[in-house]
Amino acid sequence: MSEKNEIYDESQIQVLEGLEAVRKRPGMYIGSTGTRGLHHLVYEIVDNSIDEALAGYCSHIKVFIHKDNSVTVSDDGRGMPIGIHHKMKKPTVEVIMTILHAGGKFGGGAYRVSGGLHGVGASVVNALSETCEVEVKTEGHIWKQTYHRGKVASPFEKIGDSDEHGTKIYFKPDPEIFEDTEYDYDTLSQRLRELAFLNKGIKIELTDERHDKNEIFHYEGGLKSFVSYLNRNKEVVFKEPIYVEGSIDSNYSVEIALQYNDGYNENIFSFANNIHTIEGGTHLAGFKTALTRVINDYAKKFGYLKENDKNLSGEDIREGLTAVVSVKLTEPQFEGQTKTKLGNTEVRGIVDSIISERVSTYLEENPQIGKLVIDKALVASRAREAAKKAREITRRKSVLESTSLPGKLADCSSKDAEECEIYIVEGDSAGGSAKQGRNRRFQAILPLRGKIMNVEKQRIDKILNSEEIKAMATAFGGGIGKDFDVSKLRYHKIIIMTDADVDGAHIRTLILTFFYRYMTELISEGHVFIAQPPLYKVTKTRKEYYAYSDKELEDVLQDVGGKDKNTDIQRYKGLGEMNPEQLWETTMNPEQRTLIKVNIEDAMAADEIFTILMGDKVDPRRKFIEENATKVVNLDV
C-alpha cells in the first residue's frame, strides 16, 4: 500500500464534468445545507490532505477555525500541481478548484488509495463558499489564487519564495447556501481524532481562534490507541487490545484492533479508506464470520467446548466487544449515495483469511487471554438461552392479537402507523391527564411506573423480565435487540414526556439508553422525540400565557407590561399539575407543541455518553457533569 508515484503533476488530473449544478443542488454533493453539510466542507479538504498522507507525502495537517467561522486547512504534502492543464489549458490549481470531478483520484495515477467523497472535494467547497483562497508551496515558490462563490476572482500567480512544500486552503462558507455557518468544535475534533487514529503517525492539529482552544491528535498506536480510547470509561477484560494487520499486494490492506470490556453491548466500528461505513459491508461481515469461527475452533481445541457441545454464537462471542475494522483498497465500491456500506465482494474473503490466521496465532501465543475471551462468551451463551423465553413475549403481536398489548396502554383507534404516535409518560397522574387530553384517533398513552431499569448494567435476560421494558417493547410492536424490525412499528412517533425536573431527566435518560442499546433504529430512523411541556404559566387579567424557558418567561412578562400584583406566575413541577386541556394545548397538540427530535449524529459519541452517565465508573461521570453543568438550562434543587 505504500507504493509511491513520485510525480504528481498536471498530467494526473482528469476532468469529468462542470461545476454549475453544485450551488443549485448542494445537498447532492454534501448531504445537506444544515450543520452536517457545513462540517462536511472541512472534511472534504482534510480528506485531500489525508490522501497525501496515505500516499506517503504528508505528516502534519493543520485546521484553523477563525473568529468569523471561516476555516483554513494546511498540509505539508507535495502541494497541488501548478502547471498548465494539458486539456483545459488553464492552471491546474484552477481546474481542481473550479471544475467538478477534477482530481488525482481518478485513473489511479496520483493516489493508490483515496478517501475523498468521489473526488469532488475542493471544487464543491469552493462553489459553496463566499470566499476561497488557495496557496501552494512547491518548487521553491508560493502560488496563490482567490475565488468568489466558485468563480475565479484573481489570477493564479506567484507571490513569493519558500523552501517549504504543501497546500493551504482558506474558505468562508456562503450564508446564502447554509442555514447556519457556525462550526461546532466538538464535531470537528471528533472526526479529526478519528482520522489520526486511523492513520497512525499522522499529526492533525485543530485550533479554534473563537475560543482560544488547541488540540493535537497524534497516535503512534493507531487502531490499538483507538480501541483503548473507546474503552477508556469501561472496565476492560484484558489490558492491551489485540491488534492484527495484513495486506494483499498493494491493492488491499486490513487493520483490526479489538478488546473486551465487562459490559454487554458490542461496539464494532468499521472504516473503508477512512470513511466510517455506518451500515457496515463486506469487511465487517468477513470480520464477524472469522472471529466466530476462530473462537469456536480455539474453544474446541483447548477443551472449553466438548465435541458434542453447540457452538458459541456470534452474538455470544461479541458480547462486550469493542473493535475497529479498517480496510484500505484501491477501488472501493460503496453502496448507495450515502457511501456508508462497503460492497466489494472480494474484501470479505480477504478480511476473513487475515483474521483467521492472525487472531488464531495470537490466542495460541496468549492462552490467558484466550481463556478470558472464552469464559466471557460462555457466560453470555447461558444468559442468551435464559433470554430466549422472555424474548418471545416481546415479539410483535398482530392486530388480531391486540389483547396481548399491555393493560395500561391507552391505544389509539387508527391502525395507520405513519400517523400514530405514542406518548411514554411517567406516573399515573400525568398518564391520566394525558389520556383525557389526547386525540384518541392517533395518540396512544403508555404510563410507566417509576424509573425503568438501567439497561447499561444488565444482561438481556434480566432486561426482558422488566415489566416496564416489556410494556414498551410490546406496545411499539417492533421486537427488541437483534430481533428488532423498525418496519413493524405500530407508531411512527415515540414521544417521551417526562416532568421538567431532575427525576424527569433521569427517567428520560434511562429510556433513551434502552432505545439506543436495544432498538437503535428507532433513533437512527427518526422515530424518537422529546416532548417540551411548559415551565411556567403566566396569568394576567384573566389571560393565560405559557413559557417554555426562563428567557421566554422574561419575554412574556415584558409583553404583558411587566410583573405587578395582577400577575400570577405558576412554575410547573410536574405534568400532573396541568389539567387535560392545558396538557393538550401546550404539549400534545400537533398544531402548537414543540418536539425535539433525537438523532445519532455520531454513534461513538453516543456510546461514550451513555457509558459515562449510566455505567459503573464514578470519576468519568463526575468529570462529565462538572464539564457540562454550565450547559444545564433548568435544574430543580
Curated annotation (Swiss-Prot):
A biological-process GO annotation: DNA-templated DNA replication
Coiled-coil regions, chain positions: none
Domain Toprim: 420-534
InterPro entries linked: DNA_gyrase_B_C, GyrB, HATPase_C_sf, Ribosomal_Su5_D2-typ_SF, Ribsml_uS5_D2-typ_fold_subgr, Topo_IIA, Topo_IIA-like_dom_sf, Topo_IIA_B
PROSITE patterns attached to this UniProt entry: TOPOISOMERASE_II (PS00177), TOPRIM (PS50880)
Residues that hold Mg(2+) 2 according to the record: 499, 501
Reaction(s) catalysed by this chain's protein: ATP-dependent breakage, passage and rejoining of double-stranded DNA
Top enzyme class: isomerase
Cofactor binding, per record: Binds two Mg(2+) per subunit. The magnesium ions form salt bridges with both the protein and the DNA. Can also accept other divalent metal cations, such as Mn(2+) or Ca(2+).
Cofactor(s) for this UniProt protein: Mg(2+); Mn(2+); Ca(2+)
Keywords of this entry: ATP-binding, Cytoplasm, DNA-binding, Isomerase, Magnesium, Metal-binding, Nucleotide-binding, Topoisomerase
Principal location: cytoplasm
GO CC annotation, single: chromosome
GO molecular function, one term: DNA negative supercoiling activity
Disulfide links within the chain: none
Protein name: DNA gyrase subunit B
Organism: Clostridium acetobutylicum (strain ATCC 824 / DSM 792 / JCM 1419 / IAM 19013 / LMG 5710 / NBRC 13948 / NRRL B-527 / VKM B-1787 / 2291 / W)
Lineage: Bacteria, Bacillati, Bacillota, Clostridia, Eubacteriales
